């Protein structure tokens, strides 16, 4: 069984996906971490993130490995754990550029499709493009302000600046991030984490 949980940036996808995976006793897979890892490695190599061929060649020379765990994924490049650096502001600013490249999306999709089910897959287009035949699909959303307030609780940054960055990110991600026609859309704004997890588990159990 594959459960897909897509949604806009900072809508709670990672926390919800991890909670659902733990409740079901299956791994949780974060596609976004692969895009973030590609962005981090590109930045460290001083590559132009808009140059997809060079970036892809660099990634193939430094193969990435996603370690899917219910409590949170880790991404490795050889023996180096990239995970601690994946949520810095520079990566936030560049990841949409990387994710917009069809070649990079195809590369990430191939990594994900090689993983054996069952698992919970979290991302932007898991239910529409990567696993269109998944039997359980969900899409999380919330207003930019609510998402900014949540993110500011995790990082010492100004709420208004975070909100502006999220609105810009939403525009960049619009082509990739849309709910599948058969996905259940959940507004996480008025709900707590456990309530969202409970709604998804209830839907899966029906």
Curated annotation (Swiss-Prot):
The EC number(s) this enzyme carries: 2.7.4.25
Catalysed conversion reaction: CMP + ATP = CDP + ADP; dCMP + ATP = dCDP + ADP
Subcellular location: Cytoplasm
A GO cellular component entry from the record: cytosol
Coiled coil: none
Keywords: ATP-binding, Cytoplasm, Kinase, Nucleotide-binding, Transferase
Gene3D superfamilies xrefs: P-loop containing nucleotide triphosphate hydrolases (3.40.50.300)
GO biological process terms on file: nucleobase-containing small molecule interconversion; pyrimidine nucleotide metabolic process
Residues involved in ATP binding: 7-15
Membrane-spanning ranges: none
Domain of life of the source: Bacteria
GO molecular function: (d)CMP kinase activity; ATP binding; CMP kinase activity; dCMP kinase activity
Entry-linked CDD domains: CMPK
Pfam families reported in the protein's UniProt record: Cytidylate_kin (PF02224)
Group of enzyme by EC: transferase
Keyword Lipid metabolism assigned: no
Family: Belongs to the cytidylate kinase family. Type 1 subfamily.
Entry protein name: Cytidylate kinase
Gene source species: Deinococcus radiodurans (strain ATCC 13939 / DSM 20539 / JCM 16871 / CCUG 27074 / LMG 4051 / NBRC 15346 / NCIMB 9279 / VKM B-1422 / R1)
């Amino acid at each position: 069984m594959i459960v897909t949980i897509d949604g806009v940036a900072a809508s709670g996808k990672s926390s919800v996906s991890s909670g659902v995976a733990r409740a079901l006793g299956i791994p949780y897979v974060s596609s976004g971490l692969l895009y973030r890892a590609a962005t981090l490695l590109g930045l460290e190599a001083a590559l132009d993130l808009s140059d997809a061929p060079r970036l892809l060649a660099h990634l193939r020379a430094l193969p990435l490995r996603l370690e899917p765990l219910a409590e949170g994924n880790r991404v490795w490049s050889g023996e180096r754990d990239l995970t601690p650096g994946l949520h810095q502001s520079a990566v936030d600013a560049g990841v949409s550029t990387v994710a917009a490249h069809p070649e990079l999306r195809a590369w990430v999709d191939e990594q994900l499709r090689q993983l054996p089910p069952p698992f919970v897959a979290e991302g932007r287009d898991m239910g529409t493009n990567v696993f269109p035949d998944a039997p359980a699909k969900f899409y999380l959303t919330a207003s930019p302000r609510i998402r900014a307030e949540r993110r500011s609780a995790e990082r010492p940054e100004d709420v208004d600046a975070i909100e502006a960055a999220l609105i810009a990110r939403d525009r960049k991600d619009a082509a990739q991030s849309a709910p599948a026609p058969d996905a259940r859309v959940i507004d996480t704004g008025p709900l707590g984490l456990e309530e969202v997890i409970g709604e998804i588990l209830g839907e899966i159990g029906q």
